[in-house]
Amino acid sequence: MSQQHTLPVTLPAALSQEPLKTVSPPPNTQQEHTKQPTPLPAPCQEVPSELPVEDPSKHKEKHTTPVKGVPEQEHELQQQQDSQEQELHLGQQQQQQEYQEQELHLGQQQQQQEYQEQELHLGQQQQQEYQEQELHLGQHQQQTSQEQKLHLGQQQQHQESQEQKLHLEQQQQEPQKQELHLGQQEAQEEELHLKQQQQECQKEEVHLEQQQQECQKEEVHLEQQQQECQKEEVHLEQQQQECQKEEVHLEQQQQECQKEEVHLEQQQQECQKEEVHLEQQQQETQELQQHQGAGILEQKLHQEKAQSEQQLKGQLDWEEKLLDQQLEQELAKRDEQLGKKEEQLLEPSEQQEGLLEQPTLVPAPSQLHENQAAQVPKGEVLLPIEQQRQQEVQWPVKHK
C-alpha cells in the first residue's frame, strides 16, 4: 500500500458553523451500492484527497512576508487578491468535501461524525490561523509603519542634530570670522596708514627737493644778477669812456671850429686886403683915368670888383652852409647819444633798486658832469649842454 500525503482541508467559518446536511445519493448509486456493497473504510483510515491542497505554512509565509516600500492601497489590493484566491481555493475544497461527504455518508455515521469533527476542528484551526495571520499582518504593518515613523523621526532628529551642529559650528565660526575680519580690517587700515605716511614722506621729500631747487634757482638768479651788475658796471665804465671820448671829440670839434673861425678871419683879412688892393687899384685907375681915358678904366675896375665880390660871397656862403650842416649833424648825433646814455643809466639803477637788497651805486648825470668838470683842464669852464648848443648855433651867425 503506497503512502499518501494527508493534507488538512480548511473550511470557512460559515461552513463549519452550519449543520451538516445528509445528502441522499442518487438512485443509481444506491442500487449499485446495494448490489455491490463497498467496503467501508476503517475508522482510523484517512481519505486521500485527489486535488492538491496548498500547504497552510506556505500560505502563511506568503501572507507573513513584510511588504516594505509598497503603499497601503497596493497592500490592500494584494490582501483582497489573496482573500479571493483563498475563497476560490476554499470553494474548490468545499466541492471536493461535498463529494467526499457524499461518498463517506454511505459509510458509518460515526466515522462521518468524527470526520466532521475533524473538519470542524480543522476549520476552527484554519480560522484561528487566518485570524492569527491577519493579526500578524496587522501587527507587521503596524510595526513597519512604526518602524518607518521611527526611521523618519530618527532621520529628522539626525537632520535636526546635524543642522544644530552646523548652526553651532557656524556660530562658533562667526566670532572667528569676525576676529579674522577685524584683523584683516586692522591690517588693511595699518597698511593704508603706512601708505599714507609713505606718501606724506614722499610729498615732504618732493617739497624739500622743490625748496632746494628754488634755493638753487635763487642762488643762480643772484649770481646772474651779480654778473649783470658787473656787466652794467663794465658797461657804465665803457659809457664813461665813450663820454670822455665824445668830450675829446667835441673839444677837437671846438678846436676845428676855432681853426675854421681863424680861417674865416684870415679870409676876411684877405678880403679886406683885397678891398684895400682894389681901393689902391681904383686909386691907380683914377690916376690912370686922369692920364688916360677915365671911362674905360672905370668899367674894367667895376667889372673886376663885382667879380671878386661875387666870388668871395659864393665862397663864404658855401663855407657857412657846410659848417651849419656839420654842426647840425654833430649836434643831432650828440643829442641822440646823450639821450640813449641817460636812458641806459636810469634803467639799470631802477632795476637794481627792485632786484638787489644792496643797490649798486650808479653815477647820476650830475655826478657825470662833476666828473667831466673835474677832468676839464684848469682855466676852462664847462658850460651846460643847452648853452653849448646855443653858442654853437649862434657862433657862425655872429661871424657872418
Swiss-Prot record:
Ranges where the record places region Disordered: 1-196, 273-312, 333-381
Sequence ranges of Low complexity compositional bias: 78-159, 169-186, 279-292, 346-358
Highest taxon of source: Eukaryota
Tissue expr: Keratinocytes of epidermis and other stratified squamous epithelia.
Subunit structure: Directly or indirectly cross-linked to cornifelin (CNFN).
Entry's family note: Belongs to the involucrin family.
Protein name per UniProt: Involucrin
